[in-house]
Amino acid sequence: MRHGWQMCALLIDFFGSSGKVEAQKMLERRAFENKRLLGTFNVDVDNWLDFFTYTDFVDRDGKFQLQMLKYSSFAPLGRSTSYMLREEAFHMGTGNDGLRRVVEAGVIPQWLLQKYLNKWISSSFDLFGTDHSSSAHWAYVWGIKGRYDEPQNEKTVELDDLNDYNRHLYRQEVSGLVERLNSFQRPGEKKLYTPDIKFNRSIGRWSGQRFHSETGEALDERAYQEHVAECLPSAADKAVLLDIIKNEKKWIKEKEGARDPFSTIGEPRRSAINL
């Protein structure tokens, strides 16, 4: 919501009457009945494991997009991203800390946690957009948006491969996070993995194609359907998860240093909206 307000402020302050019209359209738009423009945001988040994996990995895509806009030659846009990046950092920290505590508790089985990683990480790959995108090409040429690693990257830019380039940087970062989660597993547990970048894709060159989630090898239709049933959460898996959360009090490790929220209920609070 706050991101939208900031973009509306830019439209109103710098784009005259047409900017005000576009800002009004943005503020009036509603995304009921799963009509959000990006498919990932139409997927239900209705349990704690969904919430933690979503905020760790989907909001991480938001960090990547905002960081690319931070290098914008349109200074007001570049400056505005700092506040939004701060907000995304809170989201990612919440998700990553939650997943770590789930892994440390060791109650939710590895195979079930892996299914939710496969679900949300593969969906996040799509958020980087189509391959060979003309929009990404011209956004770079016109200085609206840079590469994620722009200040450190001295290589000649591949203008027709920008989205996929940033998508691979995202996967590298996510792979490091998954490896870190593995360091909190109990001895003997099967390691978690980052899904292959071709798996379960709805956008780009791999859209609608059939690949193994871990190895990336091509599969025929029958083998793929069997594999999807094994590596993405089903209604039965969700029922298992909800039963664990309901009946296992220690399904997540207690947060270290956590305070009872009611103990500070009378204290003045700083709203993130005012940062």
Stretches with model-predicted labels:
Residues M1-R29, N96-L99:
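Conserved alpha-helical segments that form or flank metal/cofactor-binding pockets of metalloenzymes
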Residues L10, K35-N42, Q67-M68, G98, ...:
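Domain-scale activation on soluble regions of proteins
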Residues L27-T55, A105-G106, W120-A139:
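Acidic/His metal-coordination segments adjacent to aromatic residues that form catalytic metal sites
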Residues V43-T94:
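Internal, conserved structured core segments that host functional sites
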Residues M68-L69, A75-R79, A89-A105, N153-N163, ...:
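Polyanion-binding and phosphate-handling cores
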Residues P76, S80-W138:
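A contiguous pocket-lining binding segment that forms or flanks enzyme active sites
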Residues W111-L275:
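Extended, helix-rich structural scaffolds rather than catalytic motifs
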